[in-house]
Amino acid sequence: MDLQPDDQELHRWPTLSEALEEIKAIGKISGPTTITGLLLYSRAMISMLFLGYLGELELAGGSLSIGFANITGYSVISGLAMGMEPICGQAYGAKQWKLLGLTLQRTVLLLLSTSIPISFMWLNMKRILLWCGQDQEISSVAHTFILFSIPDLFFLSLLHPLRIYLRTQNVTLPLTYCSAISVLLHVPINFLLVVHFKMGIAGVAIAMVWTNLNLFLLLSSFVYFSSVYKDSWVCPSMDCLRGWSSLLALAIPTCISVCLEWWWYEFMIMLCGLLANPKATISSMGILIQTTSLVYVFPSALSLGVSTRVGNELGANRPAKARISMIVSLVCAVALGLAAMLFTTLMRHQWGRFFTTDTEILDLTAIALPIAGLCELGNCPQTTGCGVLRGSARPTIGANINLGSFYLVGMPVAILMGFVAKMGFAGLWLGLLAAQASCALLMLYVLCNTDWMVQVERARELTRTCTMSSTPLPISSTISESNTKKSNNKANLEEVLCVSDEPVKSISLETDPLISTTTS
């Protein structure tokens, strides 16, 4: 059992050996996750290449459909799935194995339930696009693409929770291997459907769905044959339908936070359409968003790594190590931001040539790329900070920060600089810079004022281990039975999640200054 750290231990900087040890621990998770992210990015590029092969109309329709799917579906599924991350991370640190399996099952049910109304929305996509004033021909092509993408919602509802389930147990390399195999198969699948069978844009959509299905089947096979599931396996039962309050309390604000950031970039594209020469500005914005998506792979992987580390350490009652994880990851994030800024500045005249030869688009891209690099100087620390907040089960703070930074600061600045100050395309990116800067500053303020002893107390409320290791998980305990067991120090994480959330809520109100009392 870990001894409680003294006050000095929680306020000192880590030694060089501690920092190197933590870098190694984070790198063990973030390294394979980065490779996986790059592989999945290349898969998206392959799909875009095949859309371009089909023609300008198919490329426009497919791009519009993917943007619509991101806003209304993929961002929601991804955000809700991340709600299970702090529960699984802290459960793994506290050796509450069975809760891992239960949380996996509950999250799958949550995502499958969410996919149903999203599917109905996608079925009516053409009507929605026409109501928004989109071109009839492009809307028809986009509608065809998204109809064949509907099964992807259900496969992602299985895939996202499975990936988080493995990552919170520090199992990341198998995901990289499985992603590599699925991406390698993605090219021949596209060739078979698009070129050989001449299925057109429907073939590209089916290929994307097929690739996600392959990835899920490969990961499921690994989980089964490696027996990684045995300690956490819980037979599906009605217990999956209980204890949803804590999962939803984490999933909903995480989803809001993810959606707010994803939607901002779609909003930027809409604003580009209002500028002079919208074709050039929209094309340049597309190039820059693809570039920032590529750069984002690295801070995103770091964020996922530190989220797992912080959750594991808090669950294991080691607040000092959780704090070291935060410090080391933020230093790494600043280094990533500086590297991104240097890259975009040096490559501002060459990078756009990989995508186009149009002089006007190249000029706009060269002007905005250094600003995009400055944005990454704020984006990398704030993305990493979001990982720390997720690992310590405080996603509502992240949602509040994103709302305030992107929509109360960034949006007005973008409109002011782009249209009122007549700075045009560069002015829109200055709005994003203002959003990222304010987001990073608020995130750093919250993290620097975190009381790690209080955070470990919050985690302990979820991770009180039973006095007897053989005690079965009391999933069906009544409220009175739960209170009795807690008084005898036999409560565990599942009791707290299923029966009573009040201890966790009361502590979160004391330590989360940006949480509104209505959402906590």
Model-derived segments and spans:
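Transmembrane helical elements of multi-pass membrane transporters/channels
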Residues: 28-47, 148, 211-215, 219, ...
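Residue-level hotspots within pore-lining transmembrane alpha-helices
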Residues: 35, 39, 43, 72, ...
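Helix-terminus/linker motif at the lipid-water interface of multi-pass membrane proteins
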Residues: 41-60, 129-133, 192-199, 255, ...
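Small-residue-rich hydrophobic transmembrane alpha-helices
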Residues: 45-48, 59-119, 159-167, 284-348, ...
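Short alpha-helical transmembrane segments in multi-pass integral membrane proteins
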Residues: 1-33, 88-155, 173, 182-252, ...
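Alpha-helical transmembrane segments of multipass membrane proteins
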Residues: 45-49, 120, 127, 161-165, ...
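Signature of the first transmembrane helix
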Residues: 2-10, 24-85, 252-272
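Small-residue hotspots at the loop-to-helix junctions and early N-terminal turns
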Residues: 56-63, 67, 142, 146, ...
